[in-house]
Amino acid sequence: MAKQDPKDKNSDSPNLSIPINNNNNENLDNDQELLNNNNNNNNNNNNNNNNNNNNNNNNNNNNNLISSSRKHKDEESNYDSDDEKSVYQIAKEHEGEDDGDDEYFPIPLDELMPNHENDELTKKIKQTRPEDKTGLYVYCRNATYTVKHRENKKVKIKLIDDISFYLKPKEMTLILGTPGCGKSTIFQMLAGQLKDKHFKGELLFNGHPINHKNHHRDISYVTQDDIHVPTLTVKETFRFALDCLGRKELTNEEKKETVDNCMNLLGLKESENTVVGDNFVRGISGGQKKRVTIGVGVIKGSNLLLMDEPTSGLDSSTSFEILSDVKKFVTYGYSPALITLLQPSVQLTSLFDNLMILNKGRICYFGPMNKALGYFKKLGFACPSHNNPAEFFQEVVDAPERYSFIHPPKCKTSKDFVRAYRESEFYKDLMEKMDANKDGIVDDNKPKVLVDSTAKELGMYPHGIGYQTKICMKRGFTMIRRNYYNFLTRVAKGIFFGLLLGTLYWRIGHNQSGGMERFGLLFFIMVTIIFSSFAAVNSFFGERKVFYSQKALYYYKTGAYFISSIICDIPAGILEVAFFGPIVYWLANLRPVFIRFVYFMLLLIMTDNLSLSFAKMCAAISPTIEIANVIASVILSIWLLFSGFTAPKNDIGGWWIWLYYISPYTWIFQGLSINEFTYQEYGCKTSELIPPRTPQNLLPYPEGFGGNQVCQFTSGEQIMDAFGITNPNYFKWVVFGILSAYIVFFYVVCFFALKYFNFEDKKSKLAVKKLKKKKKVKTTKQDEESAAISSEALERIDDDNDDDADYETEIKKKKSHKKQKEDTVIDVKSPSSLTTGSPYYNINNNNNNLSGSGNNIKKRKVKTPSNLSPSVNSPITINSPMPTSPSNNNNNNNSNEKSKNGKDIGSETGSYLQFKKLCYAVDVKVDDPDNPKKKKSQRLQLLTDIDGYVKPGQMLALMGPSGAGKSTLLDVLAQRKTGGHITGEILINGKPPSEFTNRIRAYVEQMDVLPPTQTVREAIAFSARCRLPPEVTKEERESYVDKIVEVLSLSSIKDLKIGVLGDGLSVSQRKRVNIGVELASNPEILFLDEPTSGLDSGDAFKVIDVVNKIAKVMNRTVICTVHQPSAAIFEFFDQLLLLKQGGETIYFGPLGNQSSVILDYCDKLGMHIKPHINPADFVMTLADQGKMVEGPNGEQVPLDAKKAYFESDICKKEYEIMEGQLIPDDFVIKTYDSRFASSWMTQFRALCMRSWLSRLRRPAIFVSNCIRSILLAVLLGTLFVRMDYEQKDARSRVSLLFFSFLFAGMVAIGNIPTTVLERGVFYREVTAGFYHSTAYMTSYVLTSYPFTLSTGILYIIPTFWIAGLDSGRHSSKFWYCLFIFIITYVMYDAFGLCLAVCLPNEVMASTICGIGLSLSTLFGGFVIARPNYPSAYYWCHYLDWLRYPLEASCTNEFTGLTFVCTNNKGAVPIPIIENGVQIAIKYYCPITNGDDFMLTYGFHKFMRYIDIAAIFGYIFIFVGLSFWGFKKIRWFNR
């Protein structure tokens, strides 16, 4: 049974209306010719009744009437006019008329802030305000700031262009404008952050030029980024800001009071002891972080307040609370304020005294807020009564046709608006005031005495470097105390490695093997300390962003922060050494002399500081953490290689000996060795005497040695000499001086890098790598000093709204396109009859039925928008027979018709979604009242008995205050929850969801997780390839993708890489791409989680306009959570589900035309909306706790919103619909028999192509790995160049192979960051049903092999031949060695992949990887030969994956080799003694047979092929764990 749609309108309903827009933002090629109303404005008044009647008739004819409050996005208008009056002539004609001031805007301050003059905050401000405070008078005249284009230095870009304005105390000025308009540049100019050489014009503060030395002390600059120390509490964050920026005279009690007042003001008192938090540390909410950002900006007090988007991410009530308090600060604290906002409500806008509208660096209006509407009305632009004036101000310059009641509009481009403003009375008045007050004080009541910062000669900082260092140290130790787990980790690691090394080298003897093992132990002790401090690279990057932010705001000098950072880092190193050093020292039986033990401990502490300083230097000089790790790892490897252990000094060629001397680890190793070996005697066990007692050696001299044996090394000095260490004992103290010089050098470089570099700024720039062929990128403005083409530039390319393009030329270009059939006639009302002041058009598909057209109205052809009409040439369209209509005006009569052109993917209908008694709860830990020390589990109810439905073609808005459960409900409906307790019923087309439901639904998440290396079109095409069924041909699929790109207005950027946030597409573009990716699956139901969050009104409108097209044009079911929607956006929705705190329904039903249904409902409850109030904001007040409404007798009574709704007629009607037959009898329900639309092989091919391109488009990673391989190959090859068959060459061959495998381990660490980044994309896509997880994993692994293998090949081939390794017969040894290296690189790549997949984050994966590589080095068989391992550690040796490639390559190399001692070089002299008399000296050559030499390491020739099997075994284990991790592990919960 069909039910009456609550949105059906009667004959008394207002006309369905839409403002027409010639918006170049939508490149839809839809040249339309509108009626010229120059002669018909008066006639339209007489036709209103006819229009109303026709409007009603059309509603009853299944939406034959195209009526959309936002149809201007789909149509572009073309105006023909002979009237070429200039803008100022039009203004002159209106001079005698009413000024157009609106009695409802701005809202009076007394109404917004009752009793604001006498509340507690105002009193406190007045009491604490210094008596002599006057604030800053800002005088800016003809200011222009020009920079050179980053790529083309000859091109100069004006970021601001000849702007003039003034600011004075006690007034707030609002800046509005689209991204790239110049807002940030003005803020930087007033904050003194721009370079004078690029600035032209006059800028005065209190009549004086800017003094860069101390100007910042007069201002408070609140940035839009919430950058704070995550481990500090809210109170500590405020106190630190006040300590740094506050006046020196403030006492401790005054500071406490100031901090408390600030927290109370911002509503943060209850959270004062909660840490701020970040992505890894749980803390306060995002809205609270924004309040903290505002608080630290204003806490010092200032004479000028600059705030850049301070309410971004906050709900409307919180935003108003904060800015109303700012208003009090400004009014009663005598500080002027300049503030920019994204989507301000009418209440927020009314708080401001003045308005500045910017567009592309030029002022389009500057004047009183209460005169702004009248100014634009005189120009022919009117703000509809139901619209927020702030939206009107933001959009009128970019979309003048939308608001013009004079056609064609005389201001068509921003240049026209600038010209109109320059010709207006406002500009003339401004110039007169500035001419009359050239002293820079534009005020009728000038103060007698003004603050002069230049005269006071204030310092740059309020406090000296000593005090700054003190408070930075205090903060640093607080951070350390909060990060106690880092201390515990280092302590645990120290104890673990101390016990490991101590027991592994348990009680080493002072014999020959003990002497060699001590060298290995000392080397590994050094390496352990070095790698422990190396984690500072990652941690320092986390701190660096906060430092850059606070340095820019002049919290402290770089030196103060730097000194405190060094001091605060010392305890952690000392603590680790305090546990690690004694354990390993005494267990391993190192020299039991107290002074040597003290030296050992001091040198380890010095080593820790050296490594820490080196790691910080690498982090400070590197733009990204990846580059820092590459630089640090390469240098570290080279320094360790030349430290004297792997390659002793005597074995290093003269061309590389300089690396031995500049390596700081050389001197650490020498210091440890000298301390351990000097003045120590060594002996031999019987088995260590040389030559061994073999029959050959027992023969009498000269055939043998006559049984004579010697102990090769009898003193520590002899052992050191074998390693090239010849310095005396006192030199170990010189080592401290050498290391101190290194530490100072590293810290000095780090200090200057921090002082003069700011890599975070450079990250925000984006160089456009590729545009569509033949697409010319025009020079754009940006609010960045470097003027690189940034995401703002991409916005302008995307918008294609070039100010310099001639308006009429564009119209002519559009006319030249192929004409399409005449299908629409437009009836234009007279502007005088419009209560809203905006042009309204009735668009009727029946050309023969023109309501009230009259004889003066011309019929014109209107081209059908390309995105609304079926394509003649394409077999697939995304179009529907129903036109785009405003949701609130739509009758929602859906059609399942198919395109006549064939398979019409986009015309398939949506699904009916219904939910009944839906509840959701989670288990949380709370304090146990019976035992305060324990926690108990308690169930927290987040959603309670939620009912509702959505039909195809409808848009349902989920709204409510923060914490009401909007996103929770969306996740439950989309079945994205991974935990919690869900009860109730969800029905899709009358049936419960199944495992195949992913085929018909799509979820656009709030965080736009997209593959960064794909282009826009590739991302959408990939989704289509994986998620469309095989019945769709390639041509059809490609056509479908092209249509999506067109509808989403992504054509101009479709060939650009997506990138990452801040270094790629803008937020708005990423949002539309995300929608396109989900739309490519041809879903029947589309879920969107806050798609407008973080966008300005223009971008938010674009996104929701696209969603509206999806719902109406494609007849889809759309459910969307929205946060602070504008009136224009709110109009798009058909239904509203409003939740209150606790997740309970307080309204579910239709919105109606211009929100008439819900506003009527509110009116019946005693809530009456005033003009210019956003209906969305007004409706949200239903959810206010303790809401008071007007009772029957005019009295104020409390409102129970939930009870009122369930007793209302709307509720009864909605439940009748839900309980009745919601789904029509003729509705066709699709059925599926597979979870995935495409086959495994199709998914695999698509994934292989994407993964391959992704790796190719990250050339920096691959090229850096290749360069590193080549450099290390040349370095190691020439270090061991053309090895011969002498004694030292035998050891050198083993060292070369061992170190080569260590370098292979770098592949594992280097791939972790990329894999973790890709993992987020995988989680989103596999949850959405893109593909099988096995298809992804297989493609990811296989496509990595060419890059991994090429890295290994580029290393081993040059190394092998330069070093002169044995190639064997027919180069068989070379090919075997190459094969071993290839599979070893694959094994390490699989190891890194396994850790990146199975561990929660990059930091932990890198840490575990480093520990794993360290342990593999220790047990691999080189540092300690297998025969020398304690029996308890044999299992570690056999489990070590490094053992097998090392054994395989070494046995391959040494098989069949014979070594000699030419000229007794390397031989051991054996005195021949007979009858107690030495008769001769005979030399013994220790290493003669390669196979025997391998046995000393425990390596066996017969194991070579078993080793290959073991390597493959590890590859399968790591890859298998990776498959399991991808399939089973999800490091996030919903």
From Swiss-Prot:
Membrane-topology descriptor: Multi-pass membrane protein
GO molecular function annotations of the record: ABC-type transporter activity; ATP binding; ATP hydrolysis activity; ATPase-coupled transmembrane transporter activity
Localization = Membrane
Q: Domain named ABC transporter: which ranges?
A: 138-385, 924-1166
Thylakoid keyword on record = no
Query: Where is this chain primarily localised?
Result: membrane
| UniProt-annotated binding residues for ATP 2 | G960, P961, S962, G963, A964, G965, K966, S967
The residues forming the signal peptide are none
TM stretches of this protein: 486-506, 521-541, 566-586, 592-612, 625-645, 652-672, 734-754, 1261-1281, 1296-1316, 1345-1365, 1377-1397, 1404-1424, 1506-1526
Where is ATP 1 annotated to bind?
A: G177, T178, P179, G180, C181, G182, K183, S184
**A GO BP annotation:** sorocarp morphogenesis
From start to end residue, where is composition biased (Basic and acidic residues)? 1-11, 897-906
Family per similarity comment: Belongs to the ABC transporter superfamily. ABCG family. PDR (TC 3.A.1.205) subfamily.
The protein's name is: ABC transporter G family member 6
Lineage of producing organism: Eukaryota, Amoebozoa, Evosea, Eumycetozoa, Dictyostelia
